[in-house]
Structures are given as C-alpha cells and as structure tokens.
Amino acid sequence: MSNKKEIVVTDWIKQNCHEGNFLNLTLSSDQRRVFRGKRKSDCNQELQLQLPREGKLNDGDILLTNQKKLFVQIIAQKENLIKITAKTSIELIKVAYHLGNRHVEIEINENILFTKSDYIIEELLRNFDVVYSKVEKKFFPEIGAFHHEKKSLS
C-alpha cells in the first residue's frame, strides 16, 4: 500500500495553462472515455477521477484537482494499431463500412484508416485490395453517433 495520499480530479480546463504544478496522466483511447475511477499518474501518484460524464478526454486536456492547486495533463498513450491504405477511395470506404459493421473503432484520416491491432481484422483485410501494416501511435477513433455528449440536434 502506498503512503501517498490520493488526489481527487474534478474539473476540466480547456485552455492551455502553464502555471502551477502538473502531473501527467497517460491513457489509452478506451481509458480516455471513462471519467470516474482510480488511475495512477505517470509518476505513480494515485488519482481519483470524478469528472462530469460528457465528451471525452483529449490528448493535451488539462484537468484540475478539487483543491485547485494541481493540474493533470492528459497524454494519449501509443497503441498497437493497424494502418490501412488503398489505391482508391472506394476501396477504403468499403473497408470502413465493414469495420463499422463489426463495431470496430476506427480513426479516419485522408486516405488512411487506423484500427486496433487484431488478427481477426487482419484476416478480414485480406479480402480487400488494401495495404495494411502494424504501427504504434496515439489512437483517436471516431466517436459513435450515439455517444453521450450533450449537443442539440436542431
């Protein structure tokens, strides 16, 4: 058991702030969608997230502790991914369709898709005229249409 006191993180600060004490908190794409629970900072400091349950934690977001004396910066963790490219846009769209149909998270960039490394996905990709390779990079998947961010549809 650690002798360090747990720090409670309660607020987002969207603007970049350079004053005060900082802790870095490196999180995977899955972990950046969870706003409550225990985490450990990069220097092993125990943190308790108690953030409003909306949106997502983005790479570079600055969070504030309940005592307003310490800042926590979110860092997107590098993950094992599959990079997918194709000769034509239509082939890449077909791959995106089939991945989405399987509820696979994808990051969409111009002429490139990224998804989490998985041998089943690699088998699927063999059925398409695409080039794919394993890479390690920060992963920023598209947010689904029905995520719980508060936005008006009008």
Swiss-Prot record:
It is found in: Cytoplasm. One of its GO terms (cellular component) is cytoplasm. It holds the Pfam family UreE_C. Keywords: Chaperone, Cytoplasm, Nickel, Nickel insertion. Its main location: cytoplasm. One of its GO terms (biological process) is urea metabolic process. GO terms for molecular function: nickel cation binding; unfolded protein binding. It comes from the Bacteria. Involved in urease metallocenter assembly. Binds nickel. Probably functions as a nickel donor during metallocenter assembly. Belongs to the UreE family. This is Urease accessory protein UreE. The gene is ureE.
